[in-house]
Amino acid sequence: MIERTFVKENVKRLLIDEYFKKELSKAGYSHCDIRKTPIGTKIIIYAEKPGFVIGRRGSRIRELTETLAKEFGVEKPQIDVKPVENPDLDAQVVAQKVAQSLERGLHFRRVGHTAVRRVMNAGAKGVIVIISGKLTGERARTEKFMAGYMKHCGEPAEELVDKGRAIAKTKPGVIGVTVKIMRPDVLLPDEIIIKEDAEVKHVVEEEQ
């Protein structure tokens, strides 16, 4: 029973996250934290443009709150909005920006190179931007744009790589966008940090 409830709650969280991705894409939605409290459910939305989430005189917040309660069965939802510290290092925000640029008709190569450059300039250790679909002509294909260092498999790839996905609806068809970012503060298991001000001891052992 407990396991079933746990799975149900996780599915609900995923559905809410997908709903926010769709409804708040223009606000630069990143992710949300959902926490149960004694007085209800606190939902913290992280977005590049908090004002777009709040809406005029809080109108958007009220709409979101009502939807969460009625359609998702969230008990007494209380929404708080916080800004994303560095949008260019947030994979979901970057993915949405790439998708929006493609929808405006910008060439996919220009969009891909620009996104990679902005992420690396923000200090990332590595980035991959994957654009898939009917980019030119009738045949679908996948284009990858990358720079820096990236973990592709194993536990580090799951835990240390920030991932974001978005969809661009263009005239030729739907284009999928995937972004993976290794942030500058990520410490890899095999990485050693040497402090610049650390004193290096030099020991010489004399032979007898």
UniProtKB/Swiss-Prot annotation:
Record-level GO BP terms: translation
GO cellular component: cytosolic small ribosomal subunit
Superkingdom, taxonomy of origin: Archaea
Domain KH type-2: 16-85
Disulfide feature: none
GO molecular function, one term: structural constituent of ribosome
Signal peptide residues on this chain, from the entry's feature table: none
Keywords: Ribonucleoprotein, Ribosomal protein, RNA-binding, rRNA-binding
HAMAP family: Ribosomal_uS3_A
Main function: Binds the lower part of the 30S subunit head.
Family of the protein in this entry: Belongs to the universal ribosomal protein uS3 family.
Oligomer and partners: Part of the 30S ribosomal subunit.
Entry protein name: Small ribosomal subunit protein uS3
Organism (species): Methanocaldococcus jannaschii (strain ATCC 43067 / DSM 2661 / JAL-1 / JCM 10045 / NBRC 100440)
Taxonomic placement: Archaea, Methanobacteriati, Methanobacteriota, Methanomada group, Methanococci
Underlying gene: rps3
